[in-house]
Amino acid sequence: MSDVAAVAARMEQLLREHPRTFYALVRELGDAEYRVILQAWGSLREARRLGRDEHGLYQLRRT
């Protein structure tokens, strides 16, 4: 598994727990390089995995 895929999987796990801001996700993933975080975020967006709740926080879309 690539670093990007691993970080994307961690993002998905965090968003399963509860909706978060992008900033909160970045703080939770502090051990990952910011560039890898952005690439992982982009991969989730391209896959249309991200949605927002009524407060504007990011969450996983229901599939």
Question: At which residue positions do the language-model features occur?
Answer:
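Positively charged, polyanion-binding regions of nucleic-acid-associated proteins
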Residues: 2-18, 39-40
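Short acidic, hydrophobic short linear motifs in intrinsically disordered regions
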Residues: 17-29
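Short loop/turn and capping residues at structural boundaries
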Residues: 26, 40, 55-56
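Short amphipathic alpha-helical interaction segments
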Residues: 32-43
